[in-house]
């Protein structure tokens, strides 16, 4: 027996009204995720543009870092707070700035502002993909894939400095600043010899290779290419059916490699799996570095190189280079520690 609810009164509470308005069909979809995405993205991007244009890093790193000071698009950055600030959120209303906006900028308050709003903005974008996927009734693999770069951002900009002594050891937001951070990672963590970095490189470069191969193969096997020998003339968005042959592609790669993907689902899943796994493995490696876990150490080679001046490997050469990075970076990057290294302790050896 079926019962019918005869109470047809329209239940328009505040949530229903908000839900209808947020999900209204408009040029730019807002949705519930937009309440997180748009404000956080606006504040993060606005804070970064303000920082690289006007704000100095003289009080935090002893550097010029803005367009106003003569930097260009590659050398400008929003620098991390000084090491003395530890893990403070550096709120404008906090004890460090006390509502003094200029002081807040001087002590590096923009960096945690951008990092936190940027992280929540990225999460909002992932939730946006979930929300729209549900609305149009497709699977949420786009959102799942986008979670991989989010994991990298969170591990590098938030988890790593949380494992160290302060935000100071996170990357500053700028191109040259990121390069400096990469050199720092190599010198202090031997990052290139970390297996998680190796998996990350394999995932990202492998994904680029897969993308190039896939695009070329589809173009190779087009069989309804318009009335012209020129492929580009046939890029017609009004064509309703696909016009490439999976069978032909399978036959081609079977002859090239001896193996080939048997169906499109497995092929495209693999194209998702490779980069996502690589990025997540690299993020996991960064979490390890936050805890100061070491990369591969070939101590026997180091001992033999120390005893025998004629023995060296590419590994021992890199170890000496890492020592050089540490010695030079520590003094320049942490001026408040007042490190002074006499000439005799700087790395000298077979490799340098």
From Swiss-Prot:
In which family does this protein belong, per the annotation? Belongs to the reaction center PufL/M/PsbA/D family.
**Where is Fe cation bound in this sequence?**
214, 268
Record: residues binding pheophytin a: 129, 142
Q: Name one GO biological process term.
A: photosynthetic electron transport in photosystem II
Annotated membrane topology: Multi-pass membrane protein
Q: Where in the cell is it found?
A: Plastid, Chloroplast thylakoid membrane
Q: Which PANTHER family match?
A: PHOTOSYSTEM II D2 PROTEIN, PHOTOSYSTEM II PROTEIN D1
Annotated a plastoquinone binding lies at 214, 261
Q: Where are the transmembrane segments?
A: 40-60, 124-140, 152-165, 207-227, 278-294
Q: What else is known?
A: 2 of the reaction center chlorophylls (ChlD1 and ChlD2) are entirely coordinated by water.
One Pfam family matching this protein:
Photo_RC
> Which residues bind chlorophyll a ChlzD2 per the record?
117
- UniProt binding sites for chlorophyll a PD2: 197
Q: What terms describe the molecular function in GO for this protein?
A: chlorophyll binding; electron transporter, transferring electrons within the cyclic electron transport pathway of photosynthesis activity; iron ion binding; oxygen evolving activity
Top-level taxon of origin: Eukaryota
By what name is this protein known? Photosystem II D2 protein
Subunit-structure text: PSII is composed of 1 copy each of membrane proteins PsbA, PsbB, PsbC, PsbD, PsbE, PsbF, PsbH, PsbI, PsbJ, PsbK, PsbL, PsbM, PsbT, PsbY, PsbZ, Psb30/Ycf12, at least 3 peripheral proteins of the oxygen-evolving complex and a large number of cofactors. It forms dimeric complexes.
Q: How is the cofactor bound?
A: The D1/D2 heterodimer binds P680, chlorophylls that are the primary electron donor of PSII, and subsequent electron acceptors. It shares a non-heme iron and each subunit binds pheophytin, quinone, additional chlorophylls, carotenoids and lipids. There is also a Cl(-1) ion associated with D1 and D2, which is required for oxygen evolution. The PSII complex binds additional chlorophylls, carotenoids and specific lipids.
In short, the EC number is 1.10.3.9
A GO cellular component annotation here is: photosystem II
